[in-house]
Amino acid sequence: MSEPTAQQQPSQNGKERSKSTEEKEIPREPALVCKDIDIKTELECLVKLLDGKISKEEEVAMEELHQYLIEDDGSWALGDNFLVFVQRVLRDVQAFSPDTRIHMIRTLAYAALKDDVIIILHQDRRDHTLMNFAQDIDKHTPEEQQAWAMFTCNLFENVGPSEWLLYISEWEYNGQTISNIRVTTKVAVHCILSNCPQLKNIGSMILYNIAIKEVKTVVFDDVAVELAMAILQFFQSSPNEDQIFRTLKALARFLEVSPDVQMIIQMIGPHPKQFAGKSERVDELIKIISRKVPA
């Protein structure tokens, strides 16, 4: 999906969507998100790590962030320079430690659970601060990767942010043509194929969240095969029942939207039948997949 035009941007209070529109867009099943974030602790740690290293304007940005997350003011509380401040924390490795970035990202992951975070995301249309950082996920420390995976996963909590993750509008970054959906795909694949158990688990949650999105199939045209291949490779890593269910749900969805996925399962495997008997819900998904890809 392309990014909305200025006329299509949500209102500042996020209340102008019609009820019928909301009902059509809400996924049939709730997204899987990471809510185990102590935001007061995260902000306290962030303030200590930033002490003496930021400008007066950036101190104001931190105060605005506190208003947004603790005092529950709307995202309107965040000034126009908020993302400039975030970008400096994420990218200035000389001034800020990995721990600073981790607490910043975990703070963003908490903010991602709010429906009006979409206002912040739309402010990033020009500079792509967030998606460019995500594109480099394999270059960040393991802890930064885990925090960013949580942020990505939590953006699926509400309709607007989850749609933002799947925008197909392109831009150039480090000699590559990328888009939100391609970056989201890269994050999902990186996580699911990681040796880190935490990343694997969140990766399976992200894939599940992608699968339950009610979007036009054209959105997945360029990424369905890549995601399916990652899932098949993931099947060889002894996943648990929850992870099997999530990734089978995604595989079934990608089978619906891309005929190439059927060929990939047949040629590369393994066939999901190897998980038969894990649970009733897993068996049901295996039946659905086997109708298109006989074992």
Question: Positions of the model-derived regions?
Answer:
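Eukaryotic intrinsically disordered, low-complexity regulatory tails and linkers enriched
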Residues: 1-31
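Alpha-helical solenoid scaffolds in large eukaryotic transport, assembly, and signaling factors
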Residues: 19-177
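Amphipathic alpha-helical scaffolding segments comprising HEAT/armadillo-like alpha-solenoid repeats
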Residues: 34, 40, 80-87, 131, ...
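Helix-loop junctions that connect tandem helical modules in alpha-solenoid scaffolds
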Residues: 45-54, 88-99, 132-144, 186-198, ...
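Alpha-solenoid helical repeat scaffolds
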Residues: 103, 147, 151, 187, ...
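Hydrophobic residues within the alpha-helices of tandem HEAT/HEAT-like
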Residues: 107-113, 148-159, 203-214, 247-256, ...
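Eukaryotic alpha-helical solenoid repeat scaffolds
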Residues: 134-222, 227-231
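Eukaryotic acidic, Ser/Thr-rich intrinsically disordered low-complexity regions
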Residues: 257-295
